[in-house]
């Protein structure tokens, strides 16, 4: 499993510029996001494209996978982002529910060419409400993947926006993991909304053993 790590930064102060001092032992703010949606909507592909800028047909998660990356300084605090891709199969459901704990935001994904995946968005919203301990404070963004399949699109962007507006949820149509269309924007929107609300977890690197002790090593993107 790949993970970006923070390197030690130094401070250089000149007459016109000042760089912020930060090292690996400093506390940071962690934002945890979970990607949800029906099978074959492209959740693993979206995560792979966003983090590694790669695309491979047939990629899927086995149970749970995650990436962690540096986000940067916001209002004097240093942020890291943890994004989880959880398998939506029923046989993994009990496992994946446990990873909802501590989530600050959710990205709900549907397939622009699959009406059922759009219809099931309400199911995933209910999952968050019923299974996430922090659902009242969670931020949600809904995106439609596979917009590159122009001739097969079945979901009207207006209909998608109307649904999201009725739920007070941000919508972001026209995303393609395959063609790398608008991949960064919905993640950035979600992160900004979470940080603006002040929803994050302060982490001390000296005690940050979560990845080493709690991740099932077989749950990787393959």
From Swiss-Prot:
Main location class: membrane
InterPro entries found in the cross-reference section: P-loop_NTPase, Rab, Small_GTP-bd, Small_GTPase
Lipidation (S-geranylgeranyl cysteine): 219
An example Gene Ontology CC term for this record: plasma membrane
MF-aspect GO terms: GTP binding; GTPase activity
Key words of the record: Cell membrane, GTP-binding, Lipoprotein, Membrane, Methylation, Nucleotide-binding, Prenylation
Motif (Effector region): 59-66
Transmembrane segments: none
Any GO BP: vesicle-mediated transport
Binding residue positions for GTP: 37-44, 85-89, 145-148
Subcellular localization(s) per the UniProt record: Cell membrane
Keyword check for Cell inner membrane: no
Positions bearing Cysteine methyl ester: 219
Pro-peptide positions on chain: 220-222
Membrane topology summary: Lipid-anchor
Assigned protein family: Belongs to the small GTPase superfamily. Rab family.
Protein name: Ras-related protein RabT1
Source organism of this protein record: Dictyostelium discoideum (Social amoeba)
């Amino acid at each position: 499993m790949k993970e970006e790590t923070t390197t030690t930064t130094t401070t250089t102060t000149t007459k016109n510029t000042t760089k912020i001092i930060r090292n690996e032992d400093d506390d940071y703010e962690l934002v945890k996001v979970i990607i949800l949606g029906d099978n074959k909507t492209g959740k693993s592909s979206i995560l792979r494209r966003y983090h590694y800028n790669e695309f491979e047909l047939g990629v899927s998660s086995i149970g749970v996978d995650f990436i962690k990356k540096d986000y940067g300084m916001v209002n004097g605090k240093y942020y890291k982002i943890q994004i989880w891709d959880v398998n939506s199969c029923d046989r993994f459901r009990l496992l994946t529910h446990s990873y909802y704990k501590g989530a600050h935001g959710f990205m709900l994904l549907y397939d622009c060419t699959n009406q059922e995946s759009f219809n099931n968005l309400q199911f995933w919203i209910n999952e968050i409400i019923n299974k996430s301990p922090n659902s009242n404070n969670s931020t949600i963004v809904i995106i439609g993947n596979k917009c590159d399949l122009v001739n097969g699109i079945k979901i009207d962007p207006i209909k998608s926006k109307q649904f999201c507006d009725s739920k007070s949820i941000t919508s972001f149509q026209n995303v393609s993991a395959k063609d790398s269309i608008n991949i960064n924007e919905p993640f950035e929107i979600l992160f900004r909304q979470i940080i603006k609300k002040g929803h994050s977890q302060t982490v001390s690197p000296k005690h940050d053993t979560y990845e080493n002790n709690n991740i099932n090593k077989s749950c990787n993107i393959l």
